[in-house]
Structures are given as C-alpha cells and as structure tokens.
C-alpha cells in the first residue's frame, strides 16, 4: 500500500511526536523505510507549505529537506484530474483566496490527484464536513481512500 501524506501529518509528527525512546524511534524508522521504498510519499506543494511554515534554520525543515525526493511533482495524468476537478465550483473552494492573493501553496487537490493516480490512501487530519471542500470531501469526489493520523500511526507502529 502507498500512502500520500498531507502537510498536517508532517506537522503533527515533526512538532509533537517524540524523536527519542525505543517505541518512538521504531515509528520514525518505519517512516523512513516507507519513504526510502516509496510507499510513503507526498507532493511538492506540501514541501512548499512546510518551507513557508518552518524557519530556514529549523531542525524540522532540515528533516524535510533531507527527504525532498518523497515530495513528487504532478504528472500529466494528475493535471487532467485537477482540470476536471476544478470545473466544479464547490471544489474550487479548496484553494483559499488568501493563498492566491499571497502566492502561497495549496496542496489539497494535488494530494488527492496523486493518491488517485497511484491508487494510494491519503493520510490527513482533516475531518469530513458535508457540503465542504475539505480534503476528505475531495477524496469522496474522486473516490480516493483516506485515513486519519491515528490510523496511520497504528500502521507505522505495526511495521516497527
């Protein structure tokens, strides 16, 4: 199984998940193994979101930069998915006006398109809200499976 990680998953891991202790280190090792064998990926827009979020000299940004190869660019197939997705007015709401005005990255649609083309499961902390353009709603629109941070941590823990 391939997992596509949302920015909020990286931020939870990097900002809150301990780096020391046998059980914690095993989870970090499982994460790095998944990144190395390409079963854990993300998109370049997530990388850009985190580069904007963390200070240039932070340990978290250094960790991300050391794993830059996991942040994939969109393919032609994904671009076609995005084109069709954004024909729907409700889905256009997934890109917030403030992101457009401030030239800030917005990864949600790219994440779902990546998961769709890889037949992967998207991992996010966002919760489904009816009539919304949250990540779970975009997943529903494109018939993409998604799981929570807790579900993903359980999977990583079982691999360690």
Predicted regions and their residues:
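Short, well-structured N-terminal submotif of metal-dependent ribonuclease cores
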Residues: 1-42, 51-64
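Acidic, PIN/NYN-like endoribonuclease modules and their adjacent C-terminal/linker elements
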Residues: 2, 121, 127-160
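Short His-Asn-centered micro-motif
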Residues: 5, 43-44, 123-126
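PIN-domain endoribonuclease scaffold, especially VapC-family toxins
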Residues: 47-101
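Acidic, metal-coordinating catalytic cores used for nucleic-acid/nucleotide bond scission
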Residues: 49-54, 104, 126-131
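Acidic, metal-associated active-site segment
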Residues: 102-122, 134, 138
């Amino acid at each position: 199984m391939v997992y596509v990680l949302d920015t909020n998953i990286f931020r939870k891991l990097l900002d809150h998940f301990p780096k020391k202790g046998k059980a914690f280190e095993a989870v970090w090792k499982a994460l790095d193994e998944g990144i190395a064998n390409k079963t854990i990926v993300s998109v370049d827009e997530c990388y850009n979101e985190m580069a904007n979020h963390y200070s240039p000299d932070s340990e978290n940004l250094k960790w991300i930069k050391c794993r830059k190869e996991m942040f994939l660019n969109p393919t032609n197939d994904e671009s076609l998915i995005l084109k069709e997705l954004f024909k729907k007015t409700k889905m256009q709401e997934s890109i917030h006006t403030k992101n457009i005005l401030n030239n800030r990255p917005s990864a949600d649609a790219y994440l779902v398109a990546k998961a769709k083309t890889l037949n992967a499961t998207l991992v996010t902390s966002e919760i489904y809200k009816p009539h919304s353009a949250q990540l779970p709603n975009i997943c529903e629109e494109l018939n993409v499976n998604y799981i929570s941070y807790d579900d993903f941590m359980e999977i990583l823990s079982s691999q360690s």
